[in-house]
């Protein structure tokens, strides 16, 4: 399969998976808070990833500097970014939170230019402008619509900024490590530990509620 076709397949698969994942998050939000949902997801996925890495381990994968970069990405992405994404779905609903989360290319362009020295072409800049225009349309709110509040719009936008910052650290870490499998494992583990530790600082009602069986389904 050609690289372009393979890239398209991965992009479409990611979009389908994200949509299905968001629906499950919306359903799970009825039984637990956002922090619980993210922590359960990390608890479920990290051990199998670690087992595969252990089974396929190569000596050249040991790189503390790469692990530090990936851990920073794990704090921003799987921990902070995903919690805010779950919260956005709860407060704004799936049909608003998901399109706003799609503003990630906007922040990716900003971070790519500012931190990585990338120079996007006119097509990328035009696409970014369309994203901004779409966000303006999505956030239009009729006066009689009481199902959501504009004061919650910061949640998905800050979450997207966290994910975009995570991508910068992820890119730097993967380039040093040259193993996407190890990278996602380190990020997931770091995100799980950071989220568990930081959740102790949250109000009681926002802390992980792992004792609710329906939240795990």
Specify the residue positions occupied by each region the protein language model found:
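Hydrophobic transmembrane alpha-helices of multi-pass small-molecule transport proteins
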Residues: 111-113, 123-142
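A helix-boundary/kink motif common to multi-pass secondary transporters
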Residues: 33-34, 93-94, 120, 178-179
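Hydrophobic core positions of alpha-helical segments in small-molecule transporters
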Residues: 40-41, 100-103, 122-126, 158, ...
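Hydrophobic/aromatic residues within transmembrane alpha-helices
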Residues: 28, 37, 88, 114-120, ...
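Alpha-helical transmembrane segments of compact multi-pass small-molecule transporters, enriched
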Residues: 44-49, 100-114, 129, 190-194
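Hydrophobic alpha-helical transmembrane segments in multi-pass integral membrane proteins
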Residues: 49-59, 107-124, 161-178
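Residues that mark transmembrane-helix kinks and helix-interface sites
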Residues: 18-23, 78-86, 109, 132, ...
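Membrane-interface interhelical linkers
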Residues: 1-36, 40-72, 82-92, 140-157, ...
């Amino acid at each position: 399969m050609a690289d372009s076709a393979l890239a398209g397949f991965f992009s479409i698969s990611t979009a389908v998976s994200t949509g299905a994942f968001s629906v499950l998050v919306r359903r799970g939000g009825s039984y637990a808070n956002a922090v619980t949902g993210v922590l359960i997801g990390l608890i479920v996925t990290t051990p199998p990833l670690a087992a595969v890495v252990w089974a396929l381990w190569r000596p050249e994968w040991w790189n503390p500097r790469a692990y530090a970069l990936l851990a920073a990405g794990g704090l921003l992405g799987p921990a902070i970014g995903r919690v805010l994404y779950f919260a956005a779905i709860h407060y704004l609903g799936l049909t608003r939170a998901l399109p706003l989360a799609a503003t990630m290319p906007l922040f990716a362009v900003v971070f790519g230019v500012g931190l990585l020295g990338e120079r996007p072409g006119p097509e990328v800049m035009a696409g970014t402008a369309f994203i901004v225009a779409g966000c303006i349309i999505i956030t239009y709110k009729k006066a009689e619509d009481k199902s959501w509040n504009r004061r919650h719009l910061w949640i998905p936008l800050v979450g997207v900024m966290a994910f975009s910052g995570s991508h910068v650290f992820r890119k730097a870490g993967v380039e040093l490590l040259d193993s996407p499998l190890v990278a996602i494992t380190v990020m997931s583990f770091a995100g799980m530990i950071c989220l568990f530790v930081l959740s102790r600082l949250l109000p009681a009602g926002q802390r992980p509620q792992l004792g609710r069986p329906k939240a795990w389904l």
